[in-house]
Amino acid sequence: VAVRMQYTNSTKINSEHLTAESTYTMRHNAFAFGASFVDLEVDVPIGKIKINRVIAIHDSGQILNPALARAQVHGGVAMGIGYALTEQMLFDPETGKMRNDNLLDYKIPTAMDIPQIDVEFVETYEPSAPFGNKALGEPPMIPQAPAIRNAVLHATGVAVYELPLTPERLIHAFIQAGLIQPLSCEHIAET
């Protein structure tokens, strides 16, 4: 719905509402495809992941607005990084209430956490879509967690099967794999 407003010298505003309605029924669902490649470093003793670069490649049909499409992919990559590394809903086991129900405690990535992101599009025409395009809203988020997890596996040889890849989970997996030794209380007392 759009409104055209006409201002006159008086305090009275003349407005005319403009409305339009149209529908388009797709005959079938157009599937978007994407892949991501992640270059990262793992600080094994402290379970810290530093992502250096993400290459995100997407087939979203004909790209109608390249700048907006790139921005959409950047946002999706950032969301995927948060899902893979930090975002986790914690609940109180007795009350069932969410313990991290605010942005101070529920950790989402900031601009400082997002690496260099290179975006490439494979443009294919989708005949069932009105302009030959496909989805580009959520698809860029989806491959990030598997790409990050597989990069950690490639870097360390350790497969982790639960997200997010928090330092606690990584350290536990690295101890189980024998990459690091657990610290004993005696060792801590000596230092």
Show the residue positions of the predicted features.
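C-terminal catalytic domains of large/alpha subunits in multi-subunit enzymes
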Residues: 1-191
